[in-house]
Amino acid sequence: MQRLAHVDVTVTDLDLATAYYTEVIGMLETERDENSVYLKCWDEPNHHSLRLIYGPRVGFDLMSFKVDRDDDLEEFERRVLNYGFPVRRVSKGERVGQGESIQFETPSGQVMELVADLEMVGRATSPVNPVPFVEGLPGIAPPRLDHLL
């Protein structure tokens, strides 16, 4: 596993949660559909690192980790199955901003996901001589999700 890819959080007020994550935290909205808002930090190249999902309760639902390549998914699937946990395969295109993945549930009820292919949408800075911080962003404006948690 390389790093944290993204997390899914269920919220009861999608507009209020989106305002908090964009205005207070300083994340950038990359996409929205009827029940979800996708957000990322300014120094992240991928489509999103946080997905807010409208639902009847508040909760942390999924944590996704990036693996090197698709072949790794088969190896991790085998390992998870050997520990006795069922694995769900997710097809490319089933989840916004990513390719094929595997999902499994932890004993405490959270869904863990492993994914190899993530959609790249670019950073807010140039890859050549990037500035260390982008001026004028609202809120805290962390560079990456792993600097936010």
Where are the regions a protein language model picked out?
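N-terminal beta-strand motif that seeds the catalytic metal site of vicinal oxygen chelate
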Residues: 1-15, 45, 60-65, 126-149
